Amino acid sequence: MPLIFAKATKTSIPVIVLDSSALEDWRDAQPTRVRNWVTSSTFTAALGQVLMVPSDLGEHLCALMGYGSASKRKRGRFALADAVNKLPEGCYHLQQGLPEADLDEQALGWLLAGYSFEKYRKCPLPAVQFKVPKGVNAVRLEVIAAGEALTRDLVNTPASDMGPDQLEAACHDLAERFDAQVDVITGAALLVHNLPLIHAVGRAADQQPRLIDMRWGTQGPTLTLVGKGVCFDTGGLNLKPGNSMGLMKKDMGGAANVLGLAQMIMALDLPLCLRVLIPAVENAVSSNSFRPQDILTSRKGLTVEINNTDAEGRLVLADALALGDEERPDLMISMATLTGAARVAVGPDLAPFYTDSDALAQVLSISGARVADPVWRMPFWDPYESLIEPGIADLDNAPAGGFAGSITAALFLRRFVEQAKDYVHFDIYSWQRTAAPGRSKGGLGQGPRALLEALPHLLAL
């Protein structure tokens, strides 16, 4: 079902949102029949609770939605999204009860509640639609929901149907819809074009490694998005154990997130010059796999000692970042499912990001909170630079000891960005482990909404 609001002309059932403190006053102000109906029910205005109130004719007079308490709402996002699937099929409109500051988040939650990944199995949701609440920008929220759906679809698709070939096809599809241009460097041509790390990581796979380069827009500040596109990660010769390989279809989550964000930017026609760089590879095992102790030379000229072939994401990103940096963009952003250490540090819900700009970090943090896309700043901690310097080469792709793994990975990437005016790196999870309001189990966007909200401030749009 498209994640869109119902037409304003459609007949609809009013929705009344009540928090725990407002229920009694509202109920006491109703006609006797309604008051008795609510009193005899189990409706307490608990968060996400729903009660349909009938009219004298037995039709739906209204729907009550519980908004719980402020303390309960703070413990999650999209508090009313789950209520959607408790409603009978039909069209609804918000009549009263939501604070103006909460309208955008809850309206977006209603849209996202309609997401279902049905490529391999039909899982129809109830046909429930909402009209856009007064004061909400319907077009913007629908664009955001569509971008999130693209990200989720890409991450949810298994590697058998989402290898480098298919990820490239997804980029072409997106570019065609928005009149963007795509260039792709594939296989041995990567060496000709001086992208050796991307080639080294992906050369062992049946589908050739590639660098996907998409451009859109001709005027305005320059924004370059770099997304890790490791379509499946076996770990390479440092083979992952089985339980660690189970979710590796999502190792292209960085690419999926930058494509979702790119779609939002283009659909909203933001006045900027956009470039999207995706190194698309599969980290496979074969006779020509890159090896532990190999020393590889990057596009930038920095040499890298390979101390773990399972730390491949930073390698492919390094070449892509170096390429993007050559154009001196106003803002460069990398997104990657890069380290397990980031999950240990902040868990699966928060998207940690790194930047040297305090002003940029503040804007991102405020923006993330405003659009229910929580992000958390982590430090580019300069004293740890020595940890990524092995002695035999310029850089170590997997420092021994395991301390500060997300930070050292971010420091590694920063070595390849020198000319961009500002740089931000996101170390994301891109996965929802269990279903939550507005977030079905599976692929997840982390960071794009915060970035979209922040871009007008960061780039003076």
Model-flagged regions — what are they?
Residues 168-461:
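A generic structural signal for tightly packed, nonpolar segments enriched in small/aliphatic residues
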Residues 1-229:
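Short amphipathic alpha-helical segment within the helicase RecA-like ATPase core
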